[in-house]
Amino acid sequence: MFLQPLHRDLGKNQYGAVRESCAVIASLLMNIRSGRDAGQASEILKWIRKREEEMARLLAKLVAVPSENPPGKNYQAVAKVLEKHIRRSGLDFKRLQSKTRTKTSKERPACLLGEHGSGDRTLYFHGHYDVVPAQAAQQFKPQRRKHFLFGRGACDMKGGIVAMLYAILALKELGANLDGKIGLMLVPDEETGGARGSGRLAKEGLLGRAGIGMLSAEPTSGVVWNSNRGAISLRVEVRGKSAHVGLQHRGENAFERMHRVVERLIALKREVESRTTRYATEPEEESNHAVLPVPNRDASLGRHSILMIGGQSGGGTNFNVVPDRCCFTVDRRINPEENLQAEKERLVGVLEDCERDGIPLEWQILQEGESAASSEEEKLGRALARNIAAVRGKAPRFEMCPGLLETRFYAARGIPAYAYGPGLLSVAHGPKEYVDMRRVVECGAIYALTALEFLGK
């Protein structure tokens, strides 16, 4: 059930539901932690709900900046929008500029770090401001249709960033007493592995410092992701020798050689995809704010380990020329029960065998990341679940993210880390990406209430 207090367009009969919902939340929080000012919970809900339009305007500004990755462009522009808002809000803040530029643009990635509260105990709010490339330029012209805001990055995950910013602002403006602080981490480069964002911060010892928990605002379709798959992604190039089709005997066909490589990878794929994980992975969709399983879908299929071949492929120069090169990608997604290094060695071993058999090729690692998992029974996991249930009227499911998450950087340091955000995974990266602003508002309230419970005095 979607609780009405987070709607702006309530009718007269629904205002009773507002008061009732706030009372339920206040009562719940009183039971969670004795001495808690239950009235503060309802004040947080009211404060965030009143700012839906303000939040939508900020999100539209962020979506309008095409911070596409790859290649990693307009990072400076989107960072300036965020920086301006954070500074105007009066939060402690610093900007860490990369010393090196991206390979494909002149951009120098910037990590934005903010905090609210005092002490060493830190709950991290983590988000990434880069987005996947758009299918059309129109995707960077945000459109508002009632409660829905359309545009590249609205779902993944600029909408989630806005929710986190306003969660912190609500706690600040309402004078919430925290035993510790909220650390805000806004990074680039997530869509291509995170090396120049979270990876950089981790290497410099800045990520997760004094951390006791972490929340990420990824588009989770109403569930909580407490685990994620690891990844090893490669680009393989097979070489040949060019010749006119009429003289093909003088050439060496790179496409046919590539076919031999792919055949061996398909054999590995069959074995890999016979394995399953114990973690729940059933795809979820939302309809009228209710989380429902996708109909006619075998949920067990999502538990299989993954080896995808040919996400990108290409080669040759013309139909009448023997191709002198062909390339393709391999994307291996690894379940938490599997070992990244062992699976990497098996995958690379197939390519090395092909080389030994006389097939000239080379490969490049595009991304590499470990799987990770945090128990739903951790204090932060329980607090998050309780506050989702309080705001949405239904306890969330805990599932494994089918892809790679930056929660892994925190989990590797023993910090319980979870992803929960306002977007739908089914529209992320798609041609009609959008986010429901009511869900952005809900998530802002959930983040604030979770922080209040987790860090409250």
What is each residue range found by the language model?
Residues 91, 271-304, 308-316, 360-457:
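An extended, acidic, His-containing surface patch that forms the Zn2+-binding/catalytic region
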Residues 125, 147-192, 238, 249-269, ...:
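Alpha-helical metal-binding/catalytic segments enriched in His/Glu/Asp
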Residues 2-12, 17:
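Extreme N-terminal basic, low-complexity initiation segments
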Residues 47, 61, 65, 81, ...:
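Generic non-transmembrane alpha-helical segments
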Residues 157-233, 290-292, 299, 455:
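Acidic/histidine-rich catalytic neighborhood of metal-dependent amide-processing enzymes
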Residues 204-355, 369:
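Midchain, well-structured core segments that form catalytic/ion-binding scaffolds
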Residues 32, 36-152, 173-178, 424:
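Acidic/His- and Gly-rich active-site-bordering loop/insert found
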